[in-house]
């Protein structure tokens, strides 16, 4: 059996009772934290909560050694943990699919993720369009996909959730400031009037914690603001309902 379980967004207290129940029964627990990470806790605290040791896999081991993990699940009960929800990343979906192809029972235990946590903004979830990711620019690699996604969503009046790059192995987490700067840099190159310093944006920091940060304002005012510790995400609002306008006014710190 393969149990795919999410750990939630922030710390070990997000772990569900169902995950705790299965953790007691399984033979071995694996985890990965390169697609998302719990910034409010440590691996030791998670292990203490689950009362079992956890083998942490890096990106290469997850992407290239999944067959080994799946083979183990033929004869043993294996738990695979991720931050957030276990089925958000395509890599995790692939693991579940491959396991089912081999006739292995797969149990999926959902958990809070950024997709549920953005409800804290008061923006209507059905008005979000395609999600995009802003990554750290590298030599000869600076994808403009986020710009195109925002452009397409705005045409339809949709909000855009921008996830920010995580390089957990380097303990490098993109800030909202860096994400907004990247969007402006792409605009300067493309010059299609999609994003500017006058564009309004929302920043969510430390979603899932007891003290998340919610900030709203023009990009030119947000870009140098200190949003505190990560993780951050950015939302470019589309057409706003009057209730959403009230949410941005009263639930957010307006910069």
Curated annotation (Swiss-Prot):
Pfam families named in the record: TP_methylase
Family per record: Belongs to the diphthine synthase family.
Organism: Methanococcus maripaludis (strain C5 / ATCC BAA-1333)
E.C. code: 2.1.1.98
PANTHER family: DIPHTHINE METHYL ESTER SYNTHASE (PTHR10882:SF0), DIPHTHINE SYNTHASE (PTHR10882)
NCBIfam families xref list: dph5
Keyword set, alphabetical order: Methyltransferase, S-adenosyl-L-methionine, Transferase
Biological function: S-adenosyl-L-methionine-dependent methyltransferase that catalyzes the trimethylation of the amino group of the modified target histidine residue in translation elongation factor 2 (EF-2), to form an intermediate called diphthine. The three successive methylation reactions represent the second step of diphthamide biosynthesis.
Protein name: Diphthine synthase
Positions bound to S-adenosyl-L-methionine: 9, 85, 88, 113-114, 164, 207, 232
InterPro entries reported for this sequence: 4pyrrol_Mease, 4pyrrol_Methylase_sf, 4pyrrole_Mease_sub1, 4pyrrole_Mease_sub2, Dphthn_synthase
Reaction(s) the record says it catalyses: 2-[(3S)-amino-3-carboxypropyl]-L-histidyl-[translation elongation factor 2] + 3 S-adenosyl-L-methionine = diphthine-[translation elongation factor 2] + 3 S-adenosyl-L-homocysteine + 3 H(+)
Pathway terms, separated by semicolons: Protein modification; peptidyl-diphthamide biosynthesis
Enzyme class per UniProt: transferase
GO terms, molecular function: diphthine synthase activity
Gene coding for it: dphB
Tree of life domain: Archaea
